[in-house]
Amino acid sequence: MGGIFEADADNISKAAELIKSGKLVAFPTETVYGLGASVYDAKAVAGIFAAKGRPAFNPLISHIAEPDELAGYAAADERALFLARKFWPGPLTFVLPRKDENPALDLVCAGLKTITVRCPRHPAALELIRKSGV
């Protein structure tokens, strides 16, 4: 499946299923279009680097659907949680010490001990993140 589709509920559900099956999906955020995959699928994450021609030492941004999900990925102190709850969803990106040690996340984070996390404001992006569960 390829092409440009309206960001309606049916197509967002289809895109979420593509992500769950290891495929890449382009999606809108409030600032740019992103190329997304599951942070738990190393092959899909490697596909993002390949598709973008991105060097492996340049970490990707992980997107979440809710501010309270931040603590699941990063060692977020009270200041970070306060800022996340105040400004997310929106164009604020955190770089924090990471918590999860799965191999795919090693790729996402370019081997660093930090993770870059954002909660986009765009409704289609949020719904895609929620439905894909990643």
Show the residue positions of the predicted features:
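Active-site-adjacent structural elements in enzyme catalytic cores
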Residues: M1-V134
